[in-house]
Amino acid sequence: MQINSNMDKNLAKAMNKVSLPKRSRSYELCVRGDALRFAKLFQESVRCYLDSIMIDRNHQEAYFGLATSYKYLNNYPKAIKTLKKLTEIDDKNDKYFYELGVCYLSDGKPAEAIPHLVQSIVINRENLEAQIQLAIAHELVDESELSLMIYNKLIETNPEFLKAYYNKAAMLMGLGDFEEASKTFFQLIKRNPDYYKAYLGIAMSFDKLEKYSDAIRYYRKFLELKSFSEDALFARQRIKELKEIIPAKKEPYLKLI
């Protein structure tokens, strides 16, 4: 009984000696900045992050929050400058290089984005979003073959990553290869039959290929899933126009008969 009593006393003494470290002023300002940023008060959050960094020049969370706020304010040059500072502090964090690449893309500088996105992937091969953004960057600098290679590799190694199918198909449409685009969209809806944008992509591809009956069918399938979307008006209007085109295309054959 005495043994247990002594143990309790010793435990109580030890607990009295344990105290949680006080949060620094820099940390508190960063937390406040995060709260303002989550509330979409980006300009207000910038001030908190800057004050936090003034106290602690190596506060990574404050730098990242600051860069994110600048990005949402469309102030990409400042976001880029802040992220570059972050990569100097920690050059092993794939997230920092990824965001740096994204900001360069958003600032209309895809060539500058490429090396940072590559570095993000080198650090973390599982960063699928970085690979998608890298493909987009290559497409924007007229390196569509490299984009296609990236999309095909993503689809091969991560068949459930649906964004790779959609982006590949959209790129093929931009290149005028509507046949291959439609095939890729079909692969996508095989994976997810509710991916409504794929039906619109198929319809538009068939439309461009002058397969109007098929186009109408897939415009309707799109409308079944998204009858109140922004693109629904276009789909309905196009169905109406194609219904008028189809009889006109058949008319010459009727005259021959």
Whereabouts are the PLM-identified features?
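Canonical tetratricopeptide repeat
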Residues: 31, 65, 72, 99, ...
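Start-of-helix register in tetratricopeptide repeats
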Residues: 27, 61, 95, 129, ...
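Terminal, low-structured helical/coil segments at or just beyond the last alpha-helical repeat
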Residues: 2-18, 216-219, 223-257
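Structural signature of tandem alpha-helical TPR/SEL1-like repeats
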Residues: 8-11, 39-50, 72-85, 106-119, ...
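Long, contiguous interaction/recruitment modules in multidomain scaffold/adaptor proteins
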Residues: 1-28, 38-40, 47-65, 72-74, ...
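Position-specific recognition of the canonical hydrophobic site in helix A of tetratricopeptide repeat
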Residues: 30, 34-37, 64, 71, ...
